Regions:
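Active-site region of glycoside hydrolase catalytic domains
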Residues: 2-39, 65-67, 74-497
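Conserved catalytic and ligand/cofactor-coordination microenvironments
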Residues: 45-59, 84, 97-99, 118-119
Length: 497
């Protein structure tokens, strides 16, 4: 469990904004935030100076039975219309995700959800309805959010709904096959994505003048050693992670690495499907938080097949070969920050105590942990630059939006409010990632926008309310009152026009 020392003096809300701010990015670059928000929260976003808000539409909120034949819930349509109108009235663009893992229960019960190709047409119809009802005001559509996460946590390790996995995993799953179902689910997600894009381009894009894409979760894979086997393992890990989706979207088929290692368990696209899938995005959304070490495990005996083991690469948080960001006790990101204060009261944060000696004869405050509240999130800002260049070179430099980036902390109700709001670590996280993103733009990567995760503390899947990613604090015990953290104040200064 990460411990964040909040005894350190808070940074200034203007920390580092003279050197890096909105004007450091190209004209028209979009700054936004994402999470779940109420209509009345729009004024908070406007006050911060944001350009856009990214949110998802709940499939079953507008189609309770999952299908058009089951009827449209006009109250659900009204809810989203009101939110979109409120955003528009306050000068905020809507970036809308169509699927964020919430399969309508009726479709799961009828035919198994994304395990069945029938879902492709139902998703297409749902998307068509959304384009028809909201597309006059929504100019950026995202078909799927993190299809990898949905496929792997739902059908390989079973940690999320619908909690399916092989018996040998002993995760108390509801049935499943970890070596087969993740590939079927991803295959149908890709086909559903392409079907929705096809409808939008044929029926709506010319008149609504919007763009449509997909958001993928990403990590930078770092070889655990300089050995050739570990370097190849890092590439295999990336092929199975990012390439699982990007290769079909850019070439019409899965990469050779996956074809070789997964064999006939990996579904095949027909010639017509491949044609529909190839190039089926106007932009690419990337969710980037962290990086991981990759270690070769090509000696696996293959008895217990699963997506996780098929790549023959182990992704290392501690030296015990669990899902990890540490190798032999060495974290992948700089883990400890030191705060140095100059005579001018200017504050510097550094991972090297020697740096404090170079810039100041004053004191160094106690170090603070740099690992996030989530044990999977080690901070590795330069990974975003390496990843963006990798995509530029391998996948023809697509238009990119960073659709999620952020860091959490463990919720601690015993802390005074002032301490809770002093999130120096989050300010540093955002500033360093934005600095690398700005650098990659200058180097030729076509990044068009950045969305912080998240605008408010919210319900974080398996972590519930115990994990806080928000730049605005939500008091869950006192009427959901909102309080701006230091990071929200920093963004307000950063975004000034």
């Amino acid at each position: 469990m990460a411990i964040i020392d909040r005894t350190s003096a808070p940074l200034s809300p203007s920390y580092g904004t003279n050197a890096l701010n909105r004007t450091s990015f190209p004209k028209g670059f979009i700054f936004g935030a994402a999470s779940s928000a109420y209509q009345e929260d729009v004024s908070i976003m406007k006050g911060m100076g944001l350009d856009a808000y990214r949110f998802s539409i709940s499939w079953s909120r507008v189609l309770p039975r999952g299908k058009l034949s089951g009827g449209v819930n006009e109250e659900g349509i009204k809810y989203y219309n009101n939110l979109i109108d409120e955003l528009q009235a306050n000068g905020l663009d809507s970036y809308v995700t169509l699927f964020h893992w919430d399969v309508p229960q009726a479709l799961d019960e009828e035919y198994g959800g994304f395990l069945n190709p029938k879902i492709v047409n139902d998703f297409r119809d749902y998307a068509d309805l959304c384009f028809q009802r909201f597309g006059d005001r929504v100019k950026r559509w995202i078909t799927l959010n993190e299809p990898w996460t949905f496929a792997v946590t739902g059908y390989d390790d079973g940690s999320c709904a619908p909690s399916r996995c092989s018996d040998w995993r002993q995760n108390n799953c509801t049935g499943g096959d970890s070596g087969l179902e993740p590939y079927i689910v991803t295959h149908n997600q890709i086909l559903a994505h392409a079907a929705a894009v096809d409808v939008y381009k044929k029926k709506y894009q010319a008149t609504q003048n919007g763009l449509i894409g997909i958001t993928l979760v990403t990590k930078w894979m770092v070889a655990a050693s300089n050995s050739s086997v570990d370097r190849r393992a890092a590439q295999r890990a990336q092929d199975f992670f990012l390439g699982w989706y990007m290769d079909p979207l850019t070439t019409g088929d899965y990469c050779r690495t996956m074809r070789s290692l997964v064999g006939n368990r990996l579904p095949k696209f027909t010639a017509q499907q491949a044609k529909l899938i190839k190039g089926s995005m106007d932009f690419l959304g990337l969710n980037y938080y962290t990086a991981q070490f990759a270690v070769d495990k090509s000696s696996s005996n293959g008895v217990n097949q699963s997506y996780t083991t098929d790549s023959h690469a182990t992704l290392l948080i501690n030296c015990n070969e669990s899902v990890s960001g540490e190798l032999n006790g060495v974290p992948i990101g700089e883990k400890v920050w030191h705060i140095c204060i100059l005579a001018t009261s200017e504050v510097y944060l550094t991972t090297k105590l020697t740096f404090c000696g170079l810039i100041s004869k004053l004191h160094t405050l106690p170090s603070i942990e740099h690992q996030a509240g989530s044990n999977w999130l080690y901070v590795y800002p330069k990974g975003v630059r390496l990843l963006l260049h990798y995509i530029r070179k391998k996948y023809n430099n697509p238009i990119i939006y960073i659709t999620e980036n952020g860091i959490d902390e463990v919720s601690n109700s015993t802390l005074p409010l002032h301490d809770v709001l002093t999130d120096n670590f989050r300010v540093m996280y955002y500033r360093r990632h934005l600095s690398y993103i700005q650098r990659t733009i200058k180097e030729g990567v076509d990044v068009r926008g950045f969305f912080a995760w998240s605008i408010f503390d919210n319900f974080e899947w398996n972590s519930g309310y115990t994990s806080r990613f928000g730049v605005n604090y939500v008091d869950f015990k006192d009427g959901l009152k909102r309080y701006p953290k230091l990071s929200a104040q920093w963004f307000k200064v950063f975004l000034q026009k």
